[in-house]
Amino acid sequence: MKSTFGLLALAAAAKLVSAHATVHAVWINDVDQGAGNSADGYIRSPPNNSPITDVTSTDMTCNVNGKNPVAKTLSVKAGDKVTFEWHHDTRSDSDDIIASSHMGPVMVYMAPTEKGTAGNGWVKIAEEGYSNGKWAVANLIANRGKHSITVPDVPAGEYLLRPEIIALHEGNRQGGAQFYMECVQVKVTSAGTKTLPAGVSIPGAYKATDPGVLFDMYNSFTSYPIPGPAVWDGSSSGSSGSSGSSPATTTAPAVSVTAAPTKEAPVDTSATPTTFVTATKPATTAAPAAPSASSGSNSGSDSCNSGSASGSVKIYGQCGGQNYSGPTSCEAGLICKEWNPYYHQCVSA
């Protein structure tokens, strides 16, 4: 019996590892800049796709090895559209980007290269959380791993762009949230006049007990408080201190599409990337209480639970689990997947 349990645990652990993600490439004004996740690329990439779970670790800045510059730096101008492309394994049509259980917010920070490398001066320039019953990560998966920002009108110089995912599938326990991030090296060539605010320190922007970090996505909720500072409005230079769970609404500058010379790499371009134009922090609601027993490893098994509740659950909605009393039937084309004993989710068949 112990042997069987051990094998199941190893299988679950292997599945979790395969579900992780890193940034593989960047597009500028819809032009592919080629793979950037190597020592001779433009992304300060970690040695593997494992998440950071300790919010006090210096690896929170740019991930493991993130203090080490890489060979290339991308040239951008104010108003350029920069698209980040995430994958869990390869830049292929078959890549699943990240596990559909790893729901959570997607954010982007920016800092001058020297300050950012030291963990200081980080300004949030985009965010997407939970809206209309759908997580930002769900949109990321649907868009084949792509999400976009607009380069603000900052002074010329070298900067780091820091895209980030927070996966909350284990966020119902302290230290369970998984952080994925890399730093992309860019050089702004336009002479902007909007100096970045002082920004926040990373590590330091998040606490393990922040409502958007310690968050139980397995119980009923209607909104989600995106952690960290408010999104910079692109013009003010005031404090960018941590806003925690306070509501804030900001609008990013409009996108100006101007082609940049580059070498294109073959990659699927059929999906339209998500562009963060308006980033909204909804009013805070208290995070639901975590289950009395800690959730187990991701089993990934299909669930055929039945219950008395009626109605069909939409994609990525909960459809089962211990102490769950809601609808258990998924909409057509979906199956009810058991991620752990406490949470079953409707996903594509």
From Swiss-Prot:
Enumerate the catalysed reactions.
[(1->4)-beta-D-glucosyl]n+m + reduced acceptor + O2 = 4-dehydro-beta-D-glucosyl-[(1->4)-beta-D-glucosyl]n-1 + [(1->4)-beta-D-glucosyl]m + acceptor + H2O
How the cofactor is bound: the record states: Binds 1 copper ion per subunit.
Q: Which residues are recorded as binding O2?
A: H169
Required cofactor names? Cu(2+)
Give the main localization category. Answer: secreted
Q: Which UniProt keywords apply?
A: Carbohydrate metabolism, Cellulose degradation, Copper, Disulfide bond, Glycoprotein, Metal-binding, Monooxygenase, Oxidoreductase, Polysaccharide degradation, Secreted, Signal
User: Biotechnology applications of this protein?
Assistant: Lignocellulose is the most abundant polymeric composite on Earth and is a recalcitrant but promising renewable substrate for industrial biotechnology applications. Together with cellobiose dehydrogenases (CDHs) an enzymatic system capable of oxidative cellulose cleavage is formed, which increases the efficiency of cellulases and put LPMOs at focus of biofuel research.
One cellular component (GO) term of this entry: extracellular region
Matches recorded under InterPro entries = AA9 (IPR049892), AA9_LPMO (IPR005103), CBD_sf (IPR035971), Cellulose-bd_dom_fun (IPR000254)
Q: What is this protein called?
A: AA9 family lytic polysaccharide monooxygenase C
